[in-house]
Design a protein with these regions (language model features):
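N-terminal secretory signal peptides and thylakoid transit peptides that target proteins
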Residues: 1-17
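N-terminal low-complexity, intrinsically disordered segments
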Residues: 20-24
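Extracytoplasmic/lumenal soluble domains of exported proteins with redox or metal-associated functions
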Residues: 27-165
Length: 165
């Protein structure tokens, strides 16, 4: 059996120590840092979504189909500082308006699913975004169909560009 030199031993030891600092422990991983969880309070499933978001320490904001007050009293000022992660469980009409406003601020629709099941809602709240293609509902079918969505900063957007733009 060949002996290991001190030099090789030290290099391997230092390499292992350096690698361990690059890999965060499982307990250090955080849930998705959503700025707000938007929900349409007219629907029971959306209210349940708000309860789940609150349990995960995500601030919630209720709407009743119209996003005007939310935009002018909250999101407009926040988006001037830079794009943020936003999650919602609303009608497709509400998503349509928020998506257009968010696009102008360097954000994009990252996830969108119509009438998701409870497991999918919990997964997205915990930060698990499926890699399937984003399909924006073009024309609303049933007005009571709810859409679970995530708006996120686009790859090209930076907080400096948004603040100066």
């Amino acid at each position: 059996m060949r002996q290991c030199s001190r030099r090789i031993f030290l290099e391997c030891g230092l390499g292992a120590c350096a690698a361990s600092t690059l890999i965060p422990p499982l307990s250090a991983r955080q849930t998705m840092p959503y700025y707000k969880a938007v929900f349409d309070e007219r629907f029971e499933d959306a209210r349940a979504f708000a309860g789940q978001a609150t349990a995960r320490a995500t601030p919630t904001v209720a709407i009743r189909g119209d996003v005007t007050n939310l935009f002018f009293n909250d999101l407009d000022a926040r988006w001037k500082l830079g794009p943020v992660w936003l999650i919602g469980f609303t009608t497709s009409a509400s998503l349509f308006c928020l998506h257009l406003l968010a696009r102008d601020r360097g954000m994009r629709l990252r996830f969108c699913r119509t009438n998701p099941n409870k497991k999918a809602v919990e997964g997205v709240l915990d930060g698990a975004l499926p890699l399937d293609a984003v399909k924006v509902p073009v024309a609303p079918g049933d007005p009571s169909d709810l859409v679970l969505w995530v708006l996120a900063p686009s790859a090209r957007a930076s907080a400096k560009e948004i603040a100066n733009g």
